[in-house]
Amino acid sequence: MIKKSIFAVASAALAVGCTAVAAEAADIFTLESTTFADGKMMPKKVANSKANMATNPNCVGDDISPQFSWRNVPDGTKSLVFLMIDPEGRGGAGVNHWVAYGISPSVTGFAEGEVSKPSDKYVGGKSTQGVAFYSGPCTPPNQMAHHYTFDLIATDLAPTELPPGLTREEVTAKLAPPAQPPAHTKGVAGMVGLFVNPWHE
């Protein structure tokens, strides 16, 4: 009888612990996409196109921006920043493919192709390619897959706080000024998408 009681108590404690972990996981600031899975190869259509980048033969796609959705934005968030970076681009110097900010916390995602052009849902910054909207991968051929990182940053800055046309470096400097702690960030959610040229799944 004592053994059964101990087992029952242990089982109940385990159940409570699992429930608490599940509840905590449900509250995590999360970025997701129906276009690709985190850490997996992205479809060819998200790569930049020859129509946009006629002088770059490495652009083999249709420049269709991925679908994104997010949930559990941290309390106190006043605006969101979205950054897309290829850290292996330009021989390791990095390429900023998309810089967007001033996104209202009431926005919960972007449809596929929605940010391949300017949108009133965000303030456009300035990518390495010099545009204010999504610019897809132009991965050099015959290299290992590049890791395209997508970071959604919650901030305490008002949506109109940052002017249009800022680079990624200028945005991050505004978010975390070195001489003026604390940072203006409330949390971050991210994904990584892979792309290789020649493309294959």
Where are the language model's segments positioned?
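N-terminus-centered regions that define maturation/targeting leaders and the start
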Residues: 22-201
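Bacterial N-terminal signal peptides
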Residues: 8-17
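Positively charged n-region of N-terminal signal peptides that target proteins for export
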Residues: 1-5
